[in-house]
Amino acid sequence: MAKEQQVQANDLQEKLIAVNRVAK
């Protein structure tokens, strides 16, 4: 379960980074 949560967190972080790039 811990690994799944870690993967989800990484996926969210990547999405946030992508959104930030688009915002800029």
Curated annotation (Swiss-Prot):
Gene Ontology CC terms: ribonucleoprotein complex; ribosome
Keyword field: Ribonucleoprotein, Ribosomal protein, RNA-binding, rRNA-binding
GO molecular function: rRNA binding
Record keyword Ribonucleoprotein present: yes
Superkingdom of the organism of origin: Bacteria
Domain remarks: The N-terminal domain interacts with the head of the 30S subunit; the C-terminal domain interacts with the body and contacts protein S4. The interaction surface between S4 and S5 is involved in control of translational fidelity.
Family: Belongs to the universal ribosomal protein uS5 family.
Function of the molecule: With S4 and S12 plays an important role in translational accuracy.
Quaternary structure, from the entry: Part of the 30S ribosomal subunit. Contacts proteins S4 and S8.
Protein name as catalogued: Small ribosomal subunit protein uS5
The organism of origin for this protein: Vibrio proteolyticus
Lineage: Bacteria, Pseudomonadati, Pseudomonadota, Gammaproteobacteria, Vibrionales
